[in-house]
Amino acid sequence: MPIIKVRDNEPFDVALRRFKRSCEKAGILSEIRRREFYEKPTTERKRAKASAIKRLTKKLSRENLKRIRLY
């Protein structure tokens, strides 16, 4: 859990914004969303594999565009 210290004469809004930013950097909200509902291990593996394939195709298309632009 991210901890921030409220500085002297620091407005509450600024401290809250710093706390939210530190939570976002720590990945707490994404972890909560991921664990909100139970996901079967097979579904989790399938989702991870699909995202890996998507990353790979995206990378290959970017490389292909670089190659085309060189001409």
UniProtKB/Swiss-Prot annotation:
Domain of life: Bacteria
Keyword Cell membrane in record: no
Family recorded in the similarity comment: Belongs to the bacterial ribosomal protein bS21 family.
Keywords, ordered alphabetically: Ribonucleoprotein, Ribosomal protein
Name of the protein in question: Small ribosomal subunit protein bS21
Record-linked InterPro entries: Ribosomal_bS21, Ribosomal_bS21_CS, Ribosomal_bS21_sf
PROSITE patterns: RIBOSOMAL_S21 (PS01181)
GO terms of molecular function: structural constituent of ribosome
Pfam family for this entry, one: Ribosomal_S21
Gene Ontology CC: one annotated term: ribosome
Biological processes annotated in GO: translation
